[in-house]
């Protein structure tokens, strides 16, 4: 496959994170075409040259082009970056499949597992698209607003295709603001990005109940152990979970209120229902979906994940927060 770094990158998904990645790419000199599923929103973004809904007051670089038609977007590009919620991932793959040529290469920054099954997005992509296109996943500790503002950020890009990974690292990496680390462990990078959302809900619940820094740190530490156990059972490299896509993303999401998942947990810990909390946040809370999928995956793998299990019980089985805490604290004593 020949490559052409002068061809635009197509970013599919015009929410806050997709827009932020498109801004970062364009700022780095890459011609970038951003498409979203809502044509009216895309017209507004094209006219105003910013995403006033998600990232107000951050103007688009000249190299960022807004697209309304998916087919036209893909005709321009060789490299495709998918940035949609996990529950919409399969749908966007079905939409692009008939539009793909042999030249297209596919990367995603979606963090999650397949809705209602708990399957890795890589598995979903292979099933729908096939194996004729190179795949990569982009994940790590990145809040959309900080990325869009050009504040220093580091992230992990994982792929089994070394040429694709190296070329995308060159296209994304900006020495002044955006550092990209390469990895070959797609399983570990995907799991870290998905399950940290669930642990962040737990950290938010703990803080919402006023349990303090000690409890939050314990949740983060034991949460990382749960992620690592599940990852190893699926063939992930344990070292991945100590990197940007593991520990880095977990700490960021659990400790900063820019995280929707943490804010969702805070609201739950303060006695609000899941419906009330989601309505207040007003955006997709990936961890709400990820909790069920992670629980299903852990059950299939026969891996003990007590934090994930208790958050699942709270969200989907009406268990109250106090009983969740009691269940975790009263578990059988064990070695670390």
Swiss-Prot record:
GO terms for molecular function: glycerol-3-phosphate dehydrogenase [NAD(P)+] activity; NAD binding. SUPFAM superfamilies: 6-phosphogluconate dehydrogenase C-terminal domain-like, NAD(P)-binding Rossmann-fold domains. It is found in: Cytoplasm. The keyword Phosphoprotein does not apply. Sn-glycerol 3-phosphate binds at residues 111, 140, 142, 196, 249, 259-261. Its EC number is 1.1.1.94. Pathway: Membrane lipid metabolism; glycerophospholipid metabolism. GO terms for biological process: carbohydrate metabolic process; glycerol-3-phosphate biosynthetic process; glycerol-3-phosphate catabolic process; glycerophospholipid biosynthetic process. NADPH binds at residues 16-17, 37, 111, 144, 260, 284, 286. Signal peptide: none annotated. GO terms for cellular component: cytosol. It catalyses: sn-glycerol 3-phosphate + NAD(+) = dihydroxyacetone phosphate + NADH + H(+); sn-glycerol 3-phosphate + NADP(+) = dihydroxyacetone phosphate + NADPH + H(+). Catalyzes the reduction of the glycolytic intermediate dihydroxyacetone phosphate (DHAP) to sn-glycerol 3-phosphate (G3P), the key precursor for phospholipid synthesis. Belongs to the NAD-dependent glycerol-3-phosphate dehydrogenase family. NCBIfam families: PRK00094.1-1, PRK00094.1-2, PRK00094.1-4. This is Glycerol-3-phosphate dehydrogenase [NAD(P)+].
